[in-house]
Amino acid sequence: VYKVEQIKKPLENYRDIDAFKIYVSDLGLLCAKKDLAANDILYMVEEINDFKGGMAENYVNVQLTMNGYRTYYWESERGAEIDFIIQRDGQLIPIEVKSADNTKAKSLRVYMDTYKPTYAIKLSAKNFGCEGNKKIVPLYAAFCI
């Protein structure tokens, strides 16, 4: 997943080929590589708290890719980061992924204040809903995007 330097269409033209993230296409393989037991994942034991965010992002990237989206990410000069940006129906949609109980999305607020998208998507453990122009989608429903 490449970082985009500018939020303009087409995103492909504004990617930074030297800044990227690598995701695994199979979460089972990722967990096996990290030597995580199935119960650790199912019950989200405290010892894996530092790894939950990466797993959630990886899962969402797999779902977005399977739905045909090309994914990018964005980072501000001050360190705000949007996990994914996709192009859908001619719009650039920022997507924030939250795995922790604290679902405040400060980076998403920075992005929205700067670029004024029509709407954004926040994936978390919360149920479906809306917060202003943010659509809240449960992580388990990432395939619906």
Protein language model regions, located:
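Accessory nucleic acid-recognition modules appended to NTPase machines
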Residues: 1-82, 86
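Residue-level signature for short turns and capping positions that connect secondary-structure elements
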Residues: 29, 91, 99-100
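Short catalytic-loop micro-motif centered on adjacent basic/acidic residues
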Residues: 73, 94-97
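Structured loop/turn residues at beta-strand edges in well-structured enzyme cores
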Residues: 80, 89-90, 115
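Active-site beta-strand-loop-beta-strand hairpin of nuclease catalytic cores
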Residues: 86-94
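Catalytic cores of nucleic-acid endonucleases
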Residues: 99-139
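C-terminal helix of von Willebrand factor
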Residues: 139-145
